[in-house]
Amino acid sequence: MNYKKWIGVMMVALCATANATLYNSGFANGGVIPDGNVAGWSDTRTVSGLTAIADVSINIQLSGGFNGDLYGYLSHNNVLIPLINRVGVTAGNAFGSSGSGFNVTLSDSGSGGDVHFYGSGFASGNYTADGRNIDPASSPGSFDVAPGSRLTFASTFGGMDPNGTWTLFFADMSGGGGPSTLSSWDLEITPVPEPTNVALGCFAFLFASVQCVRWWRRKAHSEKTA
């Protein structure tokens, strides 16, 4: 068997990991987050057929209102992670960001850092979740938290059973800025690979590695004796 076939086997081994599953169904109540109404808006999706959670990420697209007024969380199995919690609010800025709208992907590896400090204007890009597990009506200084005290997707959902309902909630905590409208949200869940698949992948990789070494040794020997 030549080296191209060994490469093929190795590719199979490397691909023997769990694939992420994307959930992006429709919205309740048109996605309108009423202005100054702490009862807010929510949408629930049902997940089934997955193994334990390895990773979670979420994309949120919304327009209108003031970003600094918004509080939003993702919940599952009676636990939640604040995704957006009055972005921009600090001891020195009681009102937070005056920007309007989000098109952000939130994950533990978000390259833009903490979405709470995304800046001004329309928010876009990849960020980590706000993670400030405090009442959104807290005093402005309460939002100045140490990075290590923020919740992450891993600390909130890691290792849990993903099957069942997932709820996205948003509320506008301060009236006057107008309603916000959520146009879409995508939930992506990466499950832990099943043990059988991991074992097969490791075996295939080891087998391919050994055969590659043998092939190179035979090739080197034939060149010496040629």
Feature names for model-found ranges:
Residues 8-15:
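Bacterial N-terminal signal peptides
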Residues 21-191:
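Loop and turn regions of beta-sandwich accessory domains that flank beta-strands and are enriched
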Residues 1-7, 216:
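Bacterial N-terminal signal peptides that target proteins for export
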Residues 194-214:
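A short, hydrophobic C-terminal helix/tail in secreted or cell-surface proteins
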Residues 15, 104, 115-118, 202, ...:
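Generic recognition of cysteine residues
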Residues 6, 22-27, 224-225:
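Enriched but not universal
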Residues 16-20:
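Sec/Tat signal peptide C-region and signal peptidase I cleavage site
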Residues 209-226:
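C-terminal membrane-anchoring or membrane-association module
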